[in-house]
Amino acid sequence: MIDKIKGHIADVESFNAKTKDEIEAFRIKYLGKKGILNDFFAEFKNVPNEQKKEFGQVINELKTAAQVKVNALKEDLENNQEEKGVYGDLSRPAEPVEIGARHPISIVKNQITEIFSNIGFNVSEGPEMEDDWHNFTALNLPEYHPARDMQDTFFIQTDPDILLRTHTSSVQVRYMEENKPPIRTISPGRVFRNEAISARSHCIFHQVEGLYIDKDVSFADMKQTILYFTEQLFGKSKIRLRPSYFPFTEPSAEVDVYWGLETETDYRITKGTGWLEIMGCGMVDPNVLRNCNIDPKEYSGFAFGMGIERIAMLLYQIEDIRMFYENDLRFLEQFKSAL
């Protein structure tokens, strides 16, 4: 029996193969579940005691020789293929590679982030589940303030003080609490409002809000920053600011960009005016600065905010906001080129 095993060792050491199939057949012959090695191991119990030590040694030698031979043959085959450039038919078409696409909301968010990063703004983030102080009170919206009715809010049933944030201004409050001026930050993120879902509104959407706090910041600084943004994102260099109201800024304004009236689509989306509303803005209210332990006599600043979905709808001429959330591949695959 021992001589028979030694004969197999010699066969293993002299074996050669030229293909993967031959190597695999060799591996199965010796190392497979029904291979020669397992047959010898099964015979171990029938070997006389005085021969068991030597029998075990030669079996292990056969196993090691087979494993070494398989590995060596595989390595030689790979090396030979690389040297000869043998990878099959090189004219054969490659297997198709499925390439994904970024979501249009992510594309626009990244574009906005890059534009403001180029002028020194960093990115700040905060929790989507927020408390009353950071979402309302610190932003000059005390309890029972009538402006709270502007935002229909989702409250947490077990704790009325906890809610789903209605804007990313709450992130700005947290940032001002933790950082001293000068401050230049934008806060992109998801927000929630209890609104009816339609082609123009949704209960979940995304915002980018910006904040700039420093000494001697003026309304003109804000206008110039917004003008830079519209030129970079839309390629439009004409804007107008209309008086508006936001509890956390004073004075406040709505920003319109002149879209033009060159096409039928321009007439439709601007309702014949040539102007499109894109964001709100204003000088940070002194009460907000005080609530965040910033002295309004020393510092001033401006804030702005926009809906990412609205910007994406303008850029890509999308008429229904619900399309962003339906995960329809026919829609999403159209943005592969925007990676």
Swiss-Prot record:
Cofactor comment text: Binds 2 magnesium ions per tetramer.
Entry GO terms, CC: cytoplasm
Catalytic activity: tRNA(Phe) + L-phenylalanine + ATP = L-phenylalanyl-tRNA(Phe) + AMP + diphosphate + H(+)
InterPro entries (alphabetical): aa-tRNA-synth_II (IPR006195), aa-tRNA-synth_II/BPL/LPL (IPR045864), Phe-tRNA-synth_IIc_asu (IPR004529), Phe-tRNA_ligase_II_N (IPR004188), Phe_tRNA_ligase_alpha1_bac (IPR022911), Phenylalanyl-tRNA_Synthase (IPR002319), tRNA-bd_arm (IPR010978)
GO molecular function per UniProt: ATP binding; magnesium ion binding; phenylalanine-tRNA ligase activity; tRNA binding
Family matches, as PANTHER family: PHENYLALANINE--TRNA LIGASE, MITOCHONDRIAL, PHENYLALANYL-TRNA SYNTHETASE
NCBIfam families (UniProt xref): pheS
Protein name: Phenylalanine--tRNA ligase alpha subunit
Originating species: Christiangramia forsetii (strain DSM 17595 / CGMCC 1.15422 / KT0803) (Gramella forsetii)
Lineage, opening ranks: Bacteria, Pseudomonadati, Bacteroidota, Flavobacteriia, Flavobacteriales
Gene: pheS
